[in-house]
Swiss-Prot record:
It is found in: Secreted. Belongs to the neurotoxin 10 (Hwtx-1) family. 58 subfamily. Low-affinity blocker of Kv4.2/KCND2 voltage-gated potassium channels. Is presumed to shift the voltage-dependence of channel activation to more depolarized potentials and to bind to the S3-S4 linker region of the voltage sensor domain. The presence of a 'disulfide through disulfide knot' structurally defines this protein as a knottin. Keywords: Disulfide bond, Ion channel impairing toxin, Knottin, Neurotoxin, Potassium channel impairing toxin, Secreted, Toxin, Voltage-gated potassium channel impairing toxin. Signal peptide: none annotated. GO terms for cellular component: extracellular region. This is Kappa-theraphotoxin-Tb1b.
Amino acid sequence: DDCLGMFSSCDPKNDKCCPNRVCRSRDQWCKYKLW
């Protein structure tokens, strides 16, 4: 499976973002996890 890179649109219920990235429900983008 390909993961989603920075600022890719994503589905918060089905987060396919790359490691160390998280799908933000507010923006529906993959962003860096800061914690």
